[in-house]
Amino acid sequence: MLRTHEAGSLRADHAGQTVTLTGWVARRRDHGGVAFLDLRDASGVVQVVARDEILDAGGARELRNEYCIRITGDVRLRPEGNDNANIPTGAVEVDTTALEVLSEAAPLPFQIDDHLNVGEEARLKHRYLDLRRTGPANALKLRSAANRAARAVLEEHAFTEIETPTLTRSTPEGARDFLVPARLAPGSWYALPQSPQLFKQLLMVAGMERYYQLARCYRDEDFRADRQPEFTQLDIEMSFVEQDDVIALGEQIVAALWKLIGHDVPLPLPRMTYEEAMRRYGSDKPDLRFGLELVECAGFFADTTFRVFQAPYVGAVVMPGGASQPRKTLDAWQEWAKQRGARGLAYVLVGQDGELSGPVAKNLSDTERAGLAAHVGANPGDCIFFAAGAVNPSRALLGAARAEIARRTGAIDESAWSFLWVVDAPMFKSAAEDDDVSIGEGSWNAVHHAFTAPKPEVVDTFDTDPGSALSNAYDIVCNGNEIGGGSIRIHRRDVQERVFAVMGISEADAREKFGFLLDAFSFGAPPHGGIAFGWDRVVALLAGVDSIREVIAFPKSGGGYDPLTAAPAPITAQQRKEAGVDAKPETKKAAAGEPAGA
């Protein structure tokens, strides 16, 4: 090794020892022929004292920030009154006897300073410098600790870590695939997996019983805030289990993870049905750190003459103190709603005298005006926001308003942790209302994915009434973030084929895209289920950062662009030709036992 000690490891009991350290100059201060250097390595910072003659001997007179150096010297206690209680090494300094410059540093694009705000574009372009800062470096160390903690839980339960392919065939799972040309098969393409879903189910058929991996996944999605085209999930699958078994394991993992930051998660976690979450909170991932529940108002307005409220659904959410908002702010709420696809956000203001005002109030009957505040639980000085129309989009709008109200009013306890399971989600949703890529031609898409088992009580009827069928699925939510989700899987070929049929996937398409899975189900597939945690989001929550980019070593910026390497980038004409990008696939000759064209 080029060093005897790590810089951040030195303490008062090292005084009198001769050490050799390596690292980067974080700061230089000159005082009367002596340079005081803050030497930083991955373990921390220590003060190094170097006289001018030492710098001259090492050819380091021009030493400046971020030079990479090696020093040898004697550890000594700092002079009385010069201790630095803000750093672990603050009781000592190293009196340098030799200094060697290992690598010089060019002028920096930004200062390596934990207290300096640097634009994200510059940080990502020079990520190798950004990671020298304490915050970004600690985020990656926390991620590594989370990996170890999860592995420890799974190893304790005799799970086997297995890697699944990252070059496979395109089997759409709700988003677009990233495609890779196969040079040795011109005109044919691999796909990068959106998840290891099918392979982990095949591992259950193979008898592995307990599988996990920290899996890299890829989804070619349109730009969404805080999404990455490549991401990591902790992927888990188990044979011969029921929903409660998977949930219990998931809770053990969550408890181990949050223990890393000193928080004890009380187990078992509460559960809530999907229907209850949407009805009370307007979200399938409700943040329960605050109240502000939605109030159903369709019955209250059953006899209304106000046409807007003559709708299948009318709901409300109360903003405490919201009546004091100026007209400009109330108008801005309308723009906020329109950005979410709504026509607006109706409101009623409750005056300090209890009188109602606002554009909606004048359209209400005396009876409605008299009873509205009590019905929704509003007090004088509050604002009542309404949504009316189709049930699902109206609830979703109020759910978003609820979260926005909490942010604006400071109702969220930022130090709190709130976990819950959301269970019994619908199996299917209308394809017309779905933003994801449809994998079939039918009018129904899977809410989770096409391999989620129905609740046992609807196994025989889900395809005759898809809209009311519930899935044997479970999502875990933390502070309004879905951090993981899973389900009991389909393990019967006939059930899987019926699900494909509901989604409009023909027998021929099912055979072409998923034939290997259907075939596997013909050979004694065990009942199985699993869960996957969104690892980037989990670590971001643990680290207390707003963006998952902060916990990824080399993240992409908006639109999947990498400022560091300038990827994606064009390829040369020669590369295009060699890869067979424009080639047409040749029809394969059927091998023995293989169908033609397979």
UniProtKB/Swiss-Prot annotation:
Stored Gene3D superfamilies: Bira Bifunctional Protein, Domain 2, GAD-like domain, Nucleic acid-binding proteins
Top-level EC class as recorded in UniProt: ligase
What are this entry's molecular-function GO terms?
Answer: aspartate-tRNA ligase activity; aspartate-tRNA(Asn) ligase activity; ATP binding; nucleic acid binding
Q: Per its UniProt record, what Pfam families does this chain match?
A: GAD, tRNA-synt_2, tRNA_anti-codon
Query: Keyword annotations for this protein?
Result: Aminoacyl-tRNA synthetase, ATP-binding, Cytoplasm, Ligase, Nucleotide-binding, Protein biosynthesis
Is this entry keyworded Nucleotide-binding?
A: yes
Q: Supply the EC number(s).
A: 6.1.1.23
Positions marked as site (Important for tRNA non-discrimination): 31, 81
**What residue spans carry the region label Aspartate?**
197-200
Keyword Ribosomal protein among UniProt keywords: no
GO cellular component assignments: cytoplasm
Q: Which family does it belong to?
A: Belongs to the class-II aminoacyl-tRNA synthetase family. Type 1 subfamily.
Role = Aspartyl-tRNA synthetase with relaxed tRNA specificity since it is able to aspartylate not only its cognate tRNA(Asp) but also tRNA(Asn). Reaction proceeds in two steps: L-aspartate is first activated by ATP to form Asp-AMP and then transferred to the acceptor end of tRNA(Asp/Asn).
Q: Which HAMAP family match?
A: Asp_tRNA_synth_type1 (MF_00044)
Subunit structure as annotated in this protein's UniProt entry: Homodimer.
Q: Would you tell me the protein name for this molecule?
A: Aspartate--tRNA(Asp/Asn) ligase
Q: Which gene encodes it?
A: aspS
